[in-house]
Amino acid sequence: MNYWLFKSEPSTFSFEMLKEKGKAGTQWDGVRNYQARNNMRAMQIGDLGFFYHSNEGLDVVGIVEVCGLAHHDSTTDDPRWECVDVRAVRDVPNPPTLDQIKANEKLSKMVLVNNSRLSVQPVTPDEWKEVCRMGGLVPAP
């Protein structure tokens, strides 16, 4: 299993909105960055990810599961762009903020800390466990 971080502005698409989609989830569409697209192409069904609220909140608020492999993004006619399907798994009880993540020495190499603009990012197993611990998810899912 691999771990990821998905970023979204809560005013555009929040974790609450994803939860409303239920078990079917929804496509993580609108990504127009090659590195983020390639990250989605590497995903497997069952991979887990953090749902991160960007611009407002700046915190890890939920856990998502990849429930559909990379496929054409229906929001564009351009065949270069793909997306995966994700569904909400659970809320993070105590959402770690970006400042808290940056202050944690164990997370100093995390992509979120060093390339915070990338909208879909890999997360290492150790980073996953540490952010889960910070958020009150022990043991980590």
Task: Outline where the language-model segments fall.
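A generic structural signal for short beta-strands and their flanking turns/coil linkers
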Residues: 2, 24-27, 45-47, 60-62, ...
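Short coil-to-beta transition motif at edge beta-strands of beta-rich domains
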Residues: 40-52
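Short, charged beta-turn/beta-strand-edge "cap" motif at the junction between a beta-strand
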Residues: 52-58
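Aromatic- and Lys/Arg-enriched surface recognition patch
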Residues: 61-121
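Charged phosphate-binding loop/patch that engages nucleotide di/tri-phosphates or the phosphate backbone
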Residues: 123-141
